[in-house]
From Swiss-Prot:
GO annotation terms (biological process): tRNA methylation; tRNA wobble uridine modification
Name listed for the protein in its UniProt record: tRNA uridine 5-carboxymethylaminomethyl modification enzyme MnmG
Gene: mnmG
GO cellular component: cytosol
GO terms assigned for molecular function: flavin adenine dinucleotide binding
InterPro entries reported for this sequence: FAD/NAD-bd_sf, GIDA_C_N, MnmG, MnmG-rel, MnmG-rel_CS, MnmG_C, MnmG_C_subdom, MnmG_C_subdom_sf
Source lineage: Bacteria, Pseudomonadati, Pseudomonadota, Gammaproteobacteria, Moraxellales
Record SUPFAM superfamilies: FAD/NAD(P)-binding domain (SSF51905)
Length: 632
């Protein structure tokens, strides 16, 4: 049957990509439907119960700066918060939160159910209707047809999903959930470039069977950090400890002796697994010289005894899992509540995507999350937000944007998308700060300053968040001005206080603002002396902007040069074979990737600076010819 209501955007999948996609589209005013196989699993954390980490928290903050749900849901569910790399530079500092699975899922569902313009419907999607090269409707398992202007597909690990435990395998999207077989077959019919990837999860353990007394305690940070710019410590539930144990020689022997029973090593699994989150059997094989690996014992929530042993993801048979877990200190009597497993699933070459995450071959069909070859909640969430935003823009008549994708110098989201569509991936892609060439400008602390104004123009940022952002920016400007008006000299009282509190002896007069350039002097020192009571986020921004000013200016110069290439568009139907001087190899690579700008073309492996110059001259010449034709 035809559903009586027509939608602007239909989002398939209620995971981290799907929820952010649906929320973004609805916030922008698009009539949106979130289609999920099970309403009870909306926002479910399928693997580790944690949000954030190196590179990942930067993505979470970007989602938050654009009005998304992930960061606030984390503040409402986080049972341990830590700042990683806290002693390193501002660019690589990262917040990580251990989350209560039940509370996180509840926070996401509450946000979804209270979002205007958003409907939720429980049913698996079996088909996407395509007419004249454009997605027009979604068909459910029972034949309900939802007509729509755009479709966002966020299928996670469900497309053709196969679960492996030892040499036994079964069809599944994750443990306890059916896979999407018909939809996977339909996408293959559409001749989209498909591959197989693999991920996995460890066994879960009953905390009552664990001896924590022999493990190292890993407490959270004090004072507690928050994940969202709108978050507050008062939102946090009860805080708990995590624990650390280790594998040992006996653990490794057990695993090595049973590698022939591993689907990964027997050849049963064809999909490539995540390089930066390998299974324990892969670790033992790849790092044979190591006699021990850290294992983090993480609570799954406040109302459950289940623990997540981070670091022992596995697809080995259950009897082997039991044996190697019992070989570790503190886990000798551990009761396993759920076995670990690997899951193999379809993904589609992201080089077939536009920067908006719309497929090149089918108009108005967008992909986000693991279907694009990424791994991680955060990577999925930020893609969902981008896909949902661009899907909604198709239906918006009054927006100043036709499409929107941030550049590499604007957001880690820009880095992620550019990496995917330019280089593709043959293994699950994970974000790291090292992937960003402008990471000093792309810190987790300034995501709001980079993106919230754009989010407001797009319609993603509501009045409450916008007011908070404006107040923060006014506070930064006001406090900066105040500090520039306060002078410390070697002989005045302020200078003496600075020396007494920090040990820094002044040799000449200096403003309180300029004092922050000194490595040993921090904003909190100056605030204590001068009586400032501004928010800690404001102080942090001022201190970073002062201490890193020289480096930031140099990166900005590099960005200004790159922008000239970013602003030179390459048409999707550009004929590279007519560019005199390009080698056949470069022509083939450019024709395959179809870069949208000269800058993206320059990031394709094998495309030389000389080739970019030839392209630039050809584009310039074509523009002149076109301008002359238009004038005649």
């Amino acid at each position: 049957m035809q559903y009586p209501k027509n939608y602007d955007v239909v989002v398939i999948g209620g995971g981290h990509a799907g929820t952010e996609a649906a929320l973004a589209a609805a916030r922008m005013g698009a009539q949106t439907l979130l289609l999920t196989h099970n309403i009870e699993t909306l926002g479910q954390m399928s693997c580790n119960p944690a949000i954030g980490g190196i590179g990942k928290s930067h993505l979470v903050r970007e989602i938050d700066a654009l009005g998304g749900a992930m960061a606030l849901a984390t503040d409402k569910s986080g049972i341990q918060f830590r700042v990683l790399n806290s002693r390193k530079g501002a660019a690589v500092r990262a917040t990580r939160a251990q989350a209560d699975r039940i509370l996180y899922k509840a926070a996401i569902r509450h946000t979804l159910e209270n979002q205007p313009n958003l409907d939720i419907f429980q049913q698996a999607a079996d088909d996407i209707l395509v007419e004249n090269g454009r997605a027009t409707a979604v068909v459910t398992a029972t034949g309900i047809i939802f007509n729509t202007q755009t479709v966002v597909l966020t299928s996670g690990t469900f497309l053709g999903g196969v679960i492996h435990i030892g040499l036994e395998s079964s069809k599944g999207g994750r443990a306890g959930d059916q896979p999407s077989i018909k939809l996977a077959d339909r996408l293959r019919e559409l001749k989209l470039p498909v591959g197989r990837l693999k991920t996995g999860t460890p066994a879960r353990i009953d905390a009552r069977s664990v001896d924590f007394s022999v493990m190292a305690v890993q407490p959270g940070d004090t004072p507690l950090p928050v994940m969202s710019y709108m978050g507050d410590v008062s939102m946090h539930p009860e805080q708990v400890n995590c624990y650390i144990t280790h594998t040992n020689a006996r653990t490794h022997d057990i695993i090595r002796e049973n590698l022939d029973r591993s689907p990964m090593f027997s050849g049963k699994i064809e999909g490539v697994g995540p390089r930066y989150c390998p299974s324990i059997e892969d670790k033992i094989h790849r790092f044979a010289d190591k006699d021990s690996h850290q294992i983090f014992i993480e609570p799954e929530g406040l109302t459950t005894h289940e623990l997540y042993p981070n670091g022992i993801s596995t697809s080995l048979p259950f009897d082997v899992q039991l044996e190697f877990i019992h070989s570790m200190k503190g886990l000798e009597n551990a009761h396993i509540t759920r076995p670990g497993y690997a899951i193999e699933y379809d993904y589609f070459d992201p080089q077939n995507l536009k920067p908006t995450l719309e497929t090149k071959s089918i108009d108005r069909l967008y992909f986000a999350g693991q279907i694009n070859g990424t791994t991680g909640y955060e990577e999925a969430g930020v893609q969902g937000l981008l896909a949902g935003t661009n899907a909604a823009l198709v239906t918006c008549e009054n927006s100043e944007f036709d499409v929107w994708t941030p550049r590499r110098d604007e957001a880690y989201l820009g880095v992620l998308v550019d990496d995917l569509i330019t280089h593709g991936t043959t293994e699950p892609y994970r974000m790291f700060t090292s992937r960003a060439e402008y990471r000093l400008l792309l810190r987790e602390d300034n995501a709001d300053q980079r993106l919230t104004e754009t989010g407001r123009k797009l319609g993603l940022v509501d009045d409450v968040r916008w007011q908070a952002y404006e107040e923060k920016m006014e506070a930064i400007a006001s406090e900066t001005s105040r500090l520039k008006d306060i002078w410390a000299t070697p002989i005045n009282a302020l200078g003496a206080q600075v020396t007494a509190q920090t040990g820094e002896v002044l040799s000449k007069e200096s403003t309180a603002y300029d004092l922050l350039k000194r490595p040993q002097i921090h904003f909190n020192d100056i605030a204590a002396i001068t009586g400032s009571e501004v928010d800690s986020q404001v102080g942090e921004q001022i201190e970073i902007s002062v201490k890193y000013a020289g480096y930031i200016d140099r990166q900005q110069e590099d960005i200004d040069q790159m922008k000239r290439l970013e602003n030179t568009a390459l048409p999707m139907d550009f004929d590279y074979s007519v560019v005199s001087g390009l080698s056949n190899e470069i022509v083939q690579k450019l024709a395959q990737v179809r870069p949208s700008t000269l800058a993206q073309a320059g990031r394709i492996s094998g495309v030389t600076p000389a080739a970019i110059q030839l392209l630039a001259m050809t584009v310039k010449k074509q523009k002149k010819v076109q301008a002359a034709l238009n004038a005649s």
